Amino acid sequence: AYGAIGAGIPPYEIKKVVTVCKAYSSAVGAGAFVSEIFGDEAQELRVRGGDGGEFGATTGRPRRMGWFDCVASKYGCRLQGTTDVAFTVVDVLGYLDEIPVCTGYEIDGKVTTEFPVTNQLEKAKPVLEVLPGWKCDIRGIKKYEDLPENCRKYIEFVEKQIGFPITMISN
């Protein structure tokens, strides 16, 4: 809202808010990262990610890697007033036989799909649902219907979990 005001546009004139979500998670710095992965699994995703991999642009430091987090993404979309989601770097996941997705958090033995306060977030363990991969290169595919079935199922699963329409996909 304040960005619009600074640009001379009243907030009520904004009709569409596009939130960009990567098909997997990465983070820089410390803090809770519920879906974080480690070791060879993280390194493989890190190296394949983005244009030059998931490394800091200035420092070259490796980013922390994780599976797509539906809980955090749903919360972020809600806070931003999202109307549409652009789902990016979907092609990066094409090497995987199976793709875990974080659909909830287990905190003190209870599962929630709502984003918790910080002290609860720090105790959260991921609840993962595993989807089949598509095992092929999808770069260059322009039409949604031309994507492999399992890729479309992954996108549709995430869309249902976060509760916001994925209207754009980049590969």
Predicted regions and their residues:
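Non-transmembrane, aqueous-exposed alpha-helical and coiled segments at domain scale
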Residues: 1-171
